[in-house]
Regions:
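Structural signal for hydrophobic packing residues in well-ordered secondary-structure cores
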Residues: 14, 18-21, 25-28, 36-47, ...
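Short, flexible turn/loop "capping" segments at secondary-structure junctions
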Residues: 13-15, 212-214, 243-247, 332-339, ...
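Rossmann-like NAD(P) dinucleotide-binding subdomain of oxidoreductase/dehydrogenase enzymes
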Residues: 86-230
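Flexible, glycine/charged-enriched surface loops at secondary-structure junctions
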Residues: 26-30, 164-167, 243-246, 273-284, ...
Length: 446
C-alpha cells in the first residue's frame, strides 16, 4: 500500500468517525452509560484472550499480569467513571450561580504503544465513549493484531448496546506518515498520545490539541525508618509485574547506608541477583543501543532471559538483576529507564542525600513522572513530595500499580501526565474528565 493510499485511509477513517460522533452526540446519559457498561462487560469477558494475544504478538511481559492489566483497564476504570455525568447539565453550583454543561470533543486520535496495547485500547475507548467522542487508534506495528482484536470487541459491544457504527476504529496498516496524517487532520479534536518521546513530541507539534506523556525513570528512596520487608516486597512485586514494562515501575533503589545490609538480605531472599562489575558491564552494554536508545530486545523480558541474552549465568528463578552504582548520567543505563527487571542501587548516608540522589535521577530522565518513598515518617514522606519534580509521589506502595491507581486512590488510568516539567500538558492521571469540554452559564452576582 503506497503512502498516498494510506493517507486516504486516514481520510476515510476520520469521515466515518465524524459522522458516527455527530450522531452519538445526541445520545442521552442513560444511552451512553448503557453503551459504556457493555464495553466494560465485554472487555472484562475477553481479558484473558486479549492478554494471550498481546503476549504472543509482542513477546513482552507475562500473560497472567496482562490479564490483571486488562481487568484493571476495564473494571477499575469503569467503576471510576460509571457515575460521572457527561451529558447536558453536569453540575449546578448554586452558591456561585454557575451551571456547568458537558459537551464532547469530537474525534479523538489515540496513539497506542506496544508495551501495554490492549489495556490502553480498553482504557481509552471507555473514557472516549463515556464522553460521547469517537476514537481512532494509531497502533504500534509490533502490536497491531492485538490492538485490532481489542478494538473490534469494543466496537461490537458499543453497536450491540445501541451505538452508531464507527465510533472505534484502527489504522489497518500503521506507518509514521499515516499517524502524522491522523494527528494533523483538521477534524481531529484531540490527540491522546501514549508512546515514545518522539511520538509524543510530534503530537504536540501537530497543530491539534494533545495530551501526551513522557518517559518514566522512577527513583525509590528506602529511608532509615522504612519497614524494609514491606518495602522490598513492594519493589520486587512491582518491578517483576509484567516483567517491568509499565513506565511507572521502579528503576533505581536509593538506600540509606544504615539499612543497606538488611535491604540486600531481603532482596536476596526475594531471589534478586547482585551482579559483579564484569556482569554489570556486560549487561550495561546490552541495555542501550549505540544511539543511546533502549534496546528493544530486553524490553518485557524476565531477568533470567535477559541474562541468557547477554551471556551471564544466573539462577533460573532470579527475579531482578541489580547493579550497585554511584554515578548518575545519560551514559549510565542503570540511572535511566529500563523496561525490564533490572535495577540500579545507590547508597546514601542520610535522608537528605537520598532526596538529592532521587532528584538527580529524575533530572537525568523521567522528569515529571513518578517517584516512590518507603518510610514510616509522615514528615519524610511530605518532605520528599515537596522536593521531587514528579507528578505522582507514592508512599509505601508499588510504583507500577500505585501510579496507575490500582493500589492507591489516584484516578485509574493508563495515561500518566508528567506536567510541563516533563513536556506534558497535565500532571493528572488522564481520565474521562480530560475528554470533555465544559461550558459554564454564569449569572451576575453584583
Amino acid at each position: 500500500m503506497t503512502e498516498d493510499i494510506k493517507v486516504k485511509e486516514i481520510e476515510t477513517l476520520v469521515t466515518t468517525a465524524k459522522k458516527a460522533q455527530a450522531n452519538y452526540e445526541n445520545y442521552t446519559q442513560e444511552q451512553v452509560d448503557a453503551i459504556v457498561k457493555n464495553i466494560y462487560q465485554k472487555t472484562l469477558d475477553n481479558a484473558e484472550k486479549l492478554a494471550v494475544s498481546a503476549n504472543k504478538e509482542t513477546g513482552f511481559g507475562k500473560v497472567s499480569d496482562k490479564i490483571i492489566k486488562n481487568t484493571f483497564a476495564s473494571e477499575q476504570v469503569y467503576d471510576s467513571i460509571k457515575d460521572l455525568p457527561t451529558v447536558g447539565v453536569i453540575n449546578r453550583r448554586k452558591e456561585d450561580k454557575i451551571i456547568e454543561i458537558g459537551i464532547p470533543l469530537g474525534v479523538v486520535a489515540g496513539l497506542i504503544p506496544s508495551t501495554n496495547p490492549t489495556a490502553t485500547v480498553i482504557f481509552k475507548s471507555l473514557i472516549a465513549l463515556k464522553t460521547r467522542n469517537a476514537i481512532i487508534f494509531s497502533p504500534h506495528p509490533k502490536a497491531l493484531k492485538s490492538i485490532l482484536m481489542a478494538a473490534e470487541i469494543i466496537e461490537q459491544a458499543a453497536v450491540e448496546a445501541g451505538a452508531p457504527a464507527g465510533l472505534v476504529q484502527v489504522i489497518q496498516e500503521p506507518t509514521l506518515d499515516a499517524t502524522s496524517a491522523l494527528m494533523k487532520h483538521t477534524d481531529v479534536s484531540l490527540i491522546l498520545a501514549t508512546g515514545g518521546k518522539a511520538m509524543v513530541q510530534a503530537a504536540y507539534s501537530s497543530g491539534n490539541p494533545a495530551i501526551g506523556v513522557g518517559p518514566g525513570n522512577v527513583p525509590v528512596l528506602i529511608d532509615a525508618t522504612a519497614d524494609i520487608a514491606q518495602a522490598i516486597d513492594c519493589v520486587v512485586r512491582s518491578k517483576t509485574f509484567d516483567n517491568g514494562i509499565i513506565c511507572a515501575s521502579e528503576q533505581a533503589l536509593v538506600v540509606d547506608a544504615s539499612i543497606k545490609a538488611e535491604v540486600i538480605e531481603q532482596l536476596k531472599a526475594k531471589k534478586a541477583y547482585f551482579m559483579n562489575k564484569d556482569e554489570s558491564a556486560k549487561v550495561s552494554k546490552f541495555i542501550l543501543r549505540e544511539t543511546g536508545a533502549l534496546n528493544p530486545d530486553i524490553v518485557g523480558k524476565s531477568a533470567s532471559d535477559v541474562a541468557k541474552l547477554v551471556g551471564i549465568s544466573v539462577p533460573e528463578e532470579t527475579t531482578i538483576l541489580i547493579s550497585e552504582q554511584s554515578e548518575i548520567g545519560h551514559h549510565n543505563p542503570y540511572s535511566r529507564e529500563k523496561l525490564t527487571p533490572i535495577l540500579g542501587l545507590f547508597t546514601v548516608d542520610s535522608f537528605e542525600a537520598g532526596v538529592e540522589t532521587c532528584k538527580a535521577l529524575l533530572v537525568n530522565e523521567g522528569t515529571g513522572h513518578t517517584a516512590v518513598i518507603h518510610t514510616t515518617s509522615d514528615v519524610n514522606a511530605e518532605t520528599f513530595g515537596l522536593e521531587m519534580r514528579a507528578s505522582r509521589i507514592l508512599v509505601n506502595t508499588l510504583g507500577a500499580l500505585g501510579a496507575i491507581g490500582a493500589t492507591t486512590k489516584l484516578a485509574p488510568s493508563m495515561t500518566l501526565g508528567c506536567g510541563t516539567m516533563g513536556g506534558s500538558s497535565t500532571t493528572d492521571n488522564v481520565t474521562a474528565h480530560h475528554l470533555m469540554n465544559v461550558k459554564r452559564i454564569a449569572y451576575g452576582v453584583e
